[in-house]
Amino acid sequence: MMERKPLPIGIEDFKEVIDSGYYFVDKTLMIKDLIVNKVKVGLFTRPRRFGKTLNMSMIQRFFEKTDESNAYLFDGLKISEYPECMQYQGQYPVISISLKSMKQATFEEAFAVFKDLIRAEILRHKSVLFQNDAIEKTDLDRDRKSVV
């Protein structure tokens, strides 16, 4: 009898799901759709508990350039059957913002939390932002002041 994999209840990180051997419904062809349709910005709306955060994590782990390769996470999954898509794996900085923590009582509180989310993404990509000669530090300072 085949051993059953545990369900990833409450697990939102794609890497953890794959590395820990949780049951996973392969939705990696969503990545192919993003590439083929040349989607630059995606807004994923679904009811609660439909896996939005896990799918966002999967997309981020696919596209994001990191110190350690995430390519192995996609071995044996549907997207790995498309070399024309796999060439995009690990090539880009990815800005990923989940609004699931946005449950504040007032607009001001929600805005403060949203600014913190933006700030965290800016800091996460700080090395990429400041190594690009095309982006002037003054532009980043101006943009940062308008956001944070």
Residue ranges, per PLM feature:
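Walker A/P-loop-proximal flanking segment of P-loop NTPase domains
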Residues: M1-E81
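P-loop NTPase motor core
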Residues: G10, K15, E64-L129
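Short, glycine/acidic-rich hinge or "gate" loops at secondary-structure transitions
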Residues: S127-D139
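Conserved small/polar residues in nucleotide/adenosyl-binding loops
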Residues: V147-V148
